[in-house]
């Protein structure tokens, strides 16, 4: 049976529903890029989906078999019409080194500018759920992410939620007390030039978790973006455009609150009832 679908093979082709056989091991970059496709059913539990494999296609739904443990590279589903997504079980892939965790943004699913995406469902008993920077940028209907109580650790990258940018998740909801939460980048700011303390940023509007949970403890000690400058918004992959150029401080790590007028505020948190 077929094992590989090579780069650009079905680019700009027309399909309705596709079933990918259990023999398939690899869908390479842009294999279905820009295609007119409705639904994909994956039979293999270990198929790898390459970067931009379904980029800017009309994909509405993709179904994985129970226990799917393949690797989905970044931007595989960028600008598709997906409405929901079941996050794979990555425990084995991380333990076996199939995902290089030394990268700044490891290979985990991202959904930039998936404007119809409303829900992402995470599996139980995950040792790590890693949300890359810009993974949910430009997803206005995805208002929150909910993590099961059995989740051990969540790393949340820069997704730019602010009072003047609400096209990424507004809330992170933790159902358990023992889930650890960490910022997913080196982004921080200094209150003034002589401040030696790093003020870590998690770019979300609010953290919801049980009282005395690890997530609430983290929420009490991190900051969030209050308002982005035009320069920052210019970097949001076309979500905003202007003539002032792009500000790179937020990506660079050391972010002086005064340098580009970016403003921050303490993280809002709420106890889960």
Put a short name on every predicted segment.
Residues 1-4, 13-26, 35-48, 57-71, ...:
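Structural signature of tandem-repeat unit edges
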Residues 109-111, 197-198:
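Leucine-rich repeat
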Residues 97-104, 190-199, 236-238, 253-256, ...:
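Surface-exposed intrinsically disordered loops and tails
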Residues 185-193, 197-198, 215-226:
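Short, aromatic/basic amphipathic alpha-helical patches
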Residues 77, 111, 159-164, 186-190:
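A structural signal for leucine-rich repeat
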Residues 221-273:
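C-terminal capping region of solenoid repeat domains
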